[in-house]
Each structure stands twice: as structure tokens, then as C-alpha cells.
């Protein structure tokens, strides 16, 4: 809602959704259950080429009584056959395709003119060490069965040289969480990671544009450069160059999570107005408000990097009411502030909280419980 519909979608209206590369159904079930809880008239489609994964997803849907899902055993390259879609969810899939850029184009062709998609692709720098070992294991265990590959890989990892890049990468631990995680990370057919600039090019080739990063603060190099004289040198760079610089400086981005819309889509990011409905995301609003009141700041730690921002008590009073149940105008009135002063506070909060995936605009939960 926030990234594609500006936080203003009327959820009483029908919506058509595709989960592309749905696997065993994690994203599918979450989306379908939320829409069912909200009584949204939804038509949901699932696409995945693996019959075994589809069976698991179907069983999960049946268990929850989610009967508004259409299952298709096919590639996402055929997505347009079932569209057009108002929203496409595709997480952790495109980088596994032989031609990921073609996958971008296939999904773009399946979008409705006013629709958009949520995407996740692997990033290279935060996954340092993964690709070296993928190459190493490809040479070492290519002739073995999957089970034998895991046995050999475990032996290698137990004695992995401390100089290996993966040994010093604290952000990647999939290989420590069971055989499935190990196989998917290091023994799976090699994935193709995306830098910021490769994402830029893939979107352009698919007639798409970026609607927003899930955590835009991680793509702002000025938040990583504390020296003002150096920080000013960022100003002459293009948006994409700045984002690429931040990715390179931080070195800890494992995945890129973002939303995209068609170039012709006139969508604009939501801003505070009296009718907008802000909702704190990824943390209880009252907990964040209490932290602000006690410390006079908000701090977020993301993969080893801590970002802090000073705030005052007035901000705490505003955050406390950002539950998705009240409009911005109602929140400002509840905090006993005039609109001009409240708007200034809200705009500052929106920038900082939004930078780290903690504030969204949406009417989805206005009259509903937020749990799945």
C-alpha cells in the first residue's frame, strides 16, 4: 500500500495478486491470510515450476481455509498469461534464473498499468565469501549426489581456513542452520547477485522504475560519512551513484528489497497530510514512544551499523498514536499540537523512521487487528 498505492488504496475494492516463484508458500500464505482477515475481495495466483513445493503450499492454504488462490505449475516467465496484476510479489527468485533480466521483463509485462511489484534479490558485498565457496564446491563435489555433497561440504567447513572470506562474515549464517540452509547457500546452482547499478539497469530494460527501497537509509551515503567536507562531495552524484556508493561503503547489504512500478505509472510516494494514516512498522508504537521519551533519541542497528537520531518528547507523543488506527490530523490533535508544528514533527519522524523500515502509510489496518 505504502510503496505502490501511496497509502491511499481503498481495500474494499478487488485486487489481483501474483506470488511469482512462490515455493512452499511463506509469502503466499501471509498475503492470502491478511487479505482474508480484512475481507478484501482478492484474486491470488501462485506460480512455481516445482510440483513438490506447490503441493506443500497447497496443503498450507487448505489447512487455513484459504480457497481464493489459483495454483499454476509453471515458470514466472509465463506470468503475463494470468495477468494483469495489481501487485506482484517476487522474493528470492530472480537471481536464480539463467537470465534474471529476462525475469524482470516477464514480470513487468504482467503488471496492470497502476500496479507494482515487491522484489528481493541477493546482493554481493554482504554475502562475501559465499560466491568463492560456491565456485570451490562446484569443482569439488560436482559428481556427487546431494546428500554426499552435504557430507563433504560439512567436512570442508569444519576446517575452513580462517582467512576465508565467509569465516569472517558475521552476516551470513544459513550454512549453520541445517542441511537445507547449507545446500541452498553453497551447493545450490550458483545465483547471480545484483549490485545497485545492476538493479538500475534491469529496471530500465524492463520499463520499470524504482518506487522505493524497503530501507532507504541504507542507500544514503551521507549517513555513512561523518566528515562534512567529504559528505558534500556526494551532492554532485546521481541518485543511483549515491545508492551504489552507500552499498560499497557499508559492505553489509546481503539482499536488496525494493518496490517497482511501470515507468508510465504516475504514483508518487506518500506524504503527511491530515487524512494520511501513518503506522509504525516492525515494532509496537508504544514501545518506540517509550524509548524516545526515556532516551531522547531513536537508534537502529542494521547488520552491525548503528544509526541514531535525536528526538524530543513531542515526537514520543506522536509516535505513540501511530498504530494505523488514526489519521495524521487526529494524531496531532491527540498530542495537543497545532497542525503546522505537528506537521514539522511528523515529517522529520517520517524521514527517519521510514529510512529504516519503521513507518508506513496505509489504511489497511484502520479497522482491523494487525496480526496474521
Each PLM stretch: what is its role?
Residues 116-166:
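Conserved class I S-adenosyl-L-methionine
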Residues 86-100:
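A short SAM/SAH-binding and catalytic strip from SAM-dependent methyltransferases
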Residues 191-210:
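Short alpha-helix
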Residues 78-88:
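A short acidic, Gly/Pro-enriched loop at the edge of an enzyme's catalytic core
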Residues 221-260, 304-372:
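Long, charge-rich, low-complexity alpha-helical segments
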Residues 1-15, 30, 34:
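Conserved alpha-helix/loop element of class I SAM-dependent methyltransferases that forms part
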Residues 101-113:
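A short glycine-rich, Lys/Arg-flanked "PGG" loop and its adjoining helix->strand segment in the class I
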Residues 18, 25-78:
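Class I SAM-dependent methyltransferase SAM/SAH-binding core
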